[in-house]
Curated annotation (Swiss-Prot):
Belongs to the PBP/GOBP family. GO terms for cellular component: extracellular region. This is General odorant-binding protein 57a. It comes from Drosophila melanogaster. Present in the aqueous fluid surrounding olfactory sensory dendrites and are thought to aid in the capture and transport of hydrophobic odorants into and through this fluid. One of its GO terms (biological process) is sensory perception of smell. SUPFAM superfamilies: Insect pheromone/odorant-binding proteins.
Amino acid sequence: MFNTRLAIFLLLIVVSLSQAKESQPFDFFEGTYDDFIDCLRINNITIEEYEKFDDTDNLDNVLKENVELKHKCNIKCQLEREPTKWLNARGEVDLKSMKATSETAVSISKCMEKAPQETCAYVYKLVICAFKSGHSVIKFDSYEQIQEETAGLIAEQQADLFDYDTIDL
């Protein structure tokens, strides 16, 4: 019984990883805490203000781009500090650098046709367009990579089981 439940749980983890999608448009940011705080400071945003902005209850406003310019500039600041560059030297969307699939590239391009000229609003729109297109920053090269990611967890779980219990995936 325990064996079956554990196998189902691990299978759900693998499926979740392979289907991973951000719950908020900005969940993919990998910047350091210092970068995050610096961007907030530069844009005169408190932690409390950011938490309200990033709250799931505010998602509708975020997706409709119905947010203050300082929040858009904060997102621009954070995106500029990301290791994967989404903009070219002219500050325009760079779908190749973003590693967008052909399908998401078409969606992002179409969405960006109505992008504002103001730089913070432009970058904010890009992030929203990427999110709406399903562009994911979480990419696995292969199924083997998922197995490698979960192998340690499986080994730990197996070590905790009795000799006659096994984990089959």
